[in-house]
From Swiss-Prot:
Cross-referenced Pfam families: Amidohydro_1, Urease_alpha
Free-text remark on how the cofactor is bound: Binds 2 nickel ions per subunit.
UniProt entry keywords in alphabetical sequence: Cytoplasm, Hydrolase, Metal-binding, Nickel
HAMAP family reported for this sequence: Urease_alpha
Record family assignment: Belongs to the metallo-dependent hydrolases superfamily. Urease alpha subunit family.
Domain Urease: 133-570
Gene3D superfamilies documented for this protein: Metal-dependent hydrolases (3.20.20.140), Urease, subunit C, domain 1 (2.30.40.10)
Organism annotation: Cytophaga hutchinsonii (strain ATCC 33406 / DSM 1761 / CIP 103989 / NBRC 15051 / NCIMB 9469 / D465)
Protein's UniProt name: Urease subunit alpha
Residues modified as N6-carboxylysine: K221
Keyword Cytoplasm: yes
Length: 570
């Protein structure tokens, strides 16, 4: 006779199942479990007196090649692909299968690629949330300590440019020239993070750009501080088309060499990733935001303006002065700074994210951005939008926020991967991809990851006093783990480069796997998962009011946010 468990008892023992609702952190966001791929009564669970023992849930007689290296049991997966419960099987650093694991000799429904055997390690996923590792695709490589901070927040991939705290790097995301590209690839080789570097694209001569692509740049960056003229834009995109790499752009705030229409004309329908498309981070004032409606533009935000709060405008003026080498004693510099900070467009940016018109969210690390807050600010924005706009139409039938949550998680996982030609190996919880995974307690979702895995190996974890008798006594905080040490970093992380540079970069002697980017020139806004809305956007040049398809959009700044002082003293 079957034994009947209450939903609460089942969730306490095996984690949530189909139809259950979970609150994310201290936000107002609720998700409902869409499906459960495990088998009731045959769940795998590790521990004394539990299922994963020899001859029970753990199978005997299988070769190592036929069983999993790592099994995450009964996990709630939150991904752009869905919000569902499953076991996750990992083999050779990649996601081998997602479904029901265990011992096929005695358990029904075991996936043939999810056999738990003698060589299988286990992470208990019951009561936990699993997401893909985050991708920050607007990195100023100013200091290596950024990577420790970002990794602890759940970011596992950096894409950007720089050479350290040089004046150019503090302002622009460029790693200029073959020498610097090689040195930066070598310098980051022992850090457990997937890495990619953008070469400098500001020139009207193709040869200087081609040299950087062949040296290992995964893409190119056009920045106004180096002169983002229509000629430079056209030339850079022409070279990118030849070598199948992405171009990122910070357009001309001062409109010296042209207006937003001039840059749009220079694009000539070719794909381009527009950084901080609202404009506070830089770009044609006051209407760079209109590019969110273009089919060839992949628009992203940086996190200082997300979400719009009562402090946003004041802190931006100070940030601008420092990051762009401006002088408060020069009136023109002050005017330059003030032209970029507009409450009206910042307010509209929140709503455009909620509509799916802005496709990605990144940091702008130490250059008007906080590298450890991409994930928490994404969920703060989602919370603020639910508070101000209510349930999305797509979510009303289930009375939960599944669609909104999938839309927002796509902004820092799959969409940056697609934009930069990396989605074949990272960016989502899908079979075949590198097992870059983040494990969260629901109470701490968006703020404090419990475990971070790179290539199926734990690289960071919440850990107590190393001298204690158990792992949990205070001080309890995020610490590097074995996967972040020695040669393990190379075995579990990727160095993203252009296809044209693969042979050259293999000669650099890197430990990380050299991985060419693919499909950068064919991607369009329509390919941005759950964030492909193409509105007709206009900005009033006098009032800065933003209209979408003829309707004025705005929202009030937040006075209080979740995932903030409840979780952080400082």
């Amino acid at each position: 006779m079957s034994y009947i468990l209450s939903r609460k008892s089942y969730a306490d023992m095996f984690g949530v199942t189909t139809g259950d609702k979970i609150t994310l952190g201290d936000t107002n966001l609720l998700v409902r479990v869409e499906k459960d791929l495990t088998v009731y009564g045959e769940e795998c669970k590790f521990g004394g007196g539990k299922v994963l023992r020899d001859g029970m849930g753990q199978a005997s007689g299988y070769k190592s090649d036929d069983v999993l290296d790592l099994l995450i049991t009964n996990a709630l997966i939150i991904d752009y692909t869905g919000i569902y419960k499953a076991d996750i099987g990992i083999k050779n650093g990649h996601i081998k299968a997602i479904g029901k694991s265990g011992n096929p000799h005695i358990m029904p429904g075991v996936h043939p690629d999810m056999i738990a055997g003698t060589v299988t390690e286990v992470i208990a996923g019951e009561g936990m949330i699993i997401t893909a590792g985050g991708i920050d695709n607007h990195i100023h490589y100013i200091c290596p300590q950024q990577m420790n901070e970002a990794l602890a927040s759940g970011i596992t991939t950096f894409i950007g440019g720089g050479t350290g705290p040089a004046t150019g790097t503090k302002a622009t995301t460029c790693t200029p020239g073959a020498f610097h590209i090689e040195m930066m690839l070598k310098a980051t080789d022992n850090i457990p993070m997937n890495i990619g570097f953008l070469g400098k694209g500001n020139t009207s001569h193709p040869e200087e750009i081609e040299e950087q692509i062949k040296a290992g740049a995964l893409g190119l960056k056009l920045h106004e501080d180096w002169g983002t003229t229509p000629a430079a834009i056209d030339n850079c995109l022409s070279v990118a088309e030849k070598y199948d790499v992405q171009v990122c752009i910070h357009t001309d705030t001062l409109n010296e060499s042209g207006f937003v229409e001039s840059s749009r004309a220079a694009f000539k329908g070719r794909t381009i990733h527009t950084y901080h498309t609202e404009g506070a981070g830089g770009g044609h004032a006051p209407d760079i935001i209109v590019l969110c409606g273009d089919p060839d533009v992949l628009p992203s935000s940086t996190n200082p303006t997300k979400p719009f709060t009562v402090n946003t405008i004041d802190e931006h003026l100070d940030m601008l002065m420092v990051c762009h080498h401006l002088d408060r004693n020069i009136p023109e510099d002050v005017s330059f700074a003030e032209s970029r900070i507009r409450g009206e467009t910042i307010a509209a940016e929140d709503i455009l994210h909620d509509m799916g018109a802005l496709s990605m969210l990144s940091s702008d690390s130490q250059a008007m951005g906080r590298v450890g807050e991409v994930i928490c600010r994404t969920w703060q924005t989602a919370h603020k939008m639910k508070e101000q706009r209510g349930l999305l139409e797509e979510d009303k039938q289930i009375d939960a926020d599944n669609f909104r949550v999938k839309r927002y998680i796509a902004k820092y996982t799959i969409n940056p991967a697609i934009a930069h030609g990396c989605s074949h190996v990272i960016g989502s919880v899908e079979v075949g991809k590198l097992a870059d995974l983040v494990v969260w307690q629901p109470d701490f979702f968006g703020s404090r990851p419990e475990l971070i895995l790179k290539g199926g190996v734990i690289v960071q974890a919440q850990m107590g006093d190393p001298n204690a008798s158990i792992p949990t006594p205070q001080p309890f905080f995020s610490r590097p783990m074995f996967g972040a040490m020695g040669k393990a970093t190379g075995a579990t992380s990727l160095a993203f480069v252009s296809a044209a540079s693969e042979e050259t970069v293999n000669g650099y002697g890197l430990n990380k796997k050299v991985t060419p980017v693919v499909g950068c020139r064919s991607v369009k806004k329509k390919d941005m998962k759950l964030n492909d809305f193409l509105p007709d956007i206009k900005v009033d040049a006098e009032t800065y009011k933003v209209t979408v398809n003829g309707e004025w959009i705005t929202c009030a700044p937040a006075k209080k946010l979740p995932l903030a002082q409840l979780y952080n003293l400082f």
